Amino acid sequence: PPMRVVAINRNQRTLIPRGDHELIPGDHVFAVCDPGYISQFIELTGKQDIEINDMMILGGGLVGQFVAKNLSGEMNIKIVESNVGKSEEIANVLPNTLIIQGDGTDIDLMAVEGLQDMDAFVAVTGDDETNIISTLVARHLKVPRTIALVNTLEYLPITPTIGMDAVVSKQLLTVNAVNRFIQHQQIAAYATIPGMDVQIIEYIAGKGKICRKPIKDVGFPDDAIIGAVMHEDQMTVPKGDTLIQPGDRVVVFTRPGSIQAVERLFK
């Protein structure tokens, strides 16, 4: 199937997998996968692909309202907002969404409001601590999927260890956006994964060594892996015999120590 494991977080250690790596229970796995095979990949990990019908959002600001507006036609949504005036304002803007005025870190309140019956919980208040604590409350109440907005970069490494399924960071997105403009000419995009010693770099192939041989023969460093190749608007998960063409966009997952070796292949 068109899928590839590109990074593993094992006991706070980052691994770039090779063909002989084995996954063990508790690994946090990052993979590139064709959208049509996501369910199959999830099944391989031993997880269930949960259908989300009921979601609770903590925080009625712009982000919370945006999420609710975009998903209200697909699922039942509740918004929890601590500010009384804000709650009334949201109720007028989103008449078909149930608005609850209260403290999202109050376990008793959240249980009364049915958090334990939700398929997903999204915490997007303006306070990182509130988002983290409320997510822990959701995990305590056995909510299957949790997402938190966390802007303090120092908090990001601990988020996988406390059970968060996903973290969104506006500050990290801004840092990554800035990095795109200070990289070399052959780099189209740059990003990092919170809590992991790995960088994601999208290269534009020129006439370097990367284009002269199948990728299995170009001498790619052990701590780096090609996750995807975009050729003429067609995205593929490459194999060992894939031949990269000039102009292709190549997404590489690499440990920082291997970046220079990777860049030499594209020059």
What is the meaning of each model-derived region?
Residues 1-267:
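Cytosolic regulatory regions of ion transport systems
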